[in-house]
Amino acid sequence: MALLEIRDLTKHFFRLSALSRVSLSVEPGELLGLIGPNGSGKTTLFNCVTGVLHPSAGQVFFRGEDITGRSADVVYRRGIARTFQLIQLFPEMTVLDNMLVSGQEKTGRLFSRLLRREGAEATARALALLEFLGIAGLRDNLASNLSYGQQKLLDFGMALMSEPQVIMLDEPMAGVNPTMIKNLVAHILELNARGYTFVVIEHNMEVVMSLCRRIVVLSQGERIAEGTPAEIAENPL
């Protein structure tokens, strides 16, 4: 059984069709790439899966449970975490405090509800993740004082705090330098080797080809292709 299954997902904004009957499945431990031009529906699909938007039609199943239209809070607690194109941090809080505060019902700009993890276990997990990401030495720094690449790492770490079964990354490499891209790719691959499941939106085709085992292509709200990196490279769209 697929870990995440999307069936005929459709989203309309007034007369505009942002998604049209898109179906795909994600297997446990998979690293799936989602590509397509701007406006192809990639982020809209993420938003419908994670409860930020309600789909106009279609269904989303997670571990066999229909989660279509459930709130972002419920989806998050079921085990699906995500990052946004716009980094979601609390700038006047320390790096460690950012890790200990989970945003529920993210809208893309705001945390509409907050849940702070307390206790030694939560702190230990936060510190272990910061160590893994290479920013443990910044634990007491304000998030606003971090470089953009460091903020990307912190945002990624916050998504990992809930021990999610699926992590959806929206343009994780956007705006970062080549060294940080290699760093992020290495972290994603290591976590995937540990059993974490990823769905990644990414415009950097070199990254997608090296990172993902399977790629789905969207265009104008429709799924138009699927294959391995080699198959997609052989049949450019």
Residue ranges and their predicted role:
Residues 100, 112-141, 186-189, 237:
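Conserved ABC ATPase "signature" region
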Residues 58-65, 78:
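Conserved ABC transporter NBD signature motif
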Residues 50:
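Helix-to-loop junction immediately C-terminal to a conserved catalytic motif
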Residues 167-171:
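Catalytic Walker B motif of ABC-type/P-loop ATPase nucleotide-binding domains
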Residues 35-37:
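The feature captures the beta-strand-to-loop junction immediately N-terminal to the Walker
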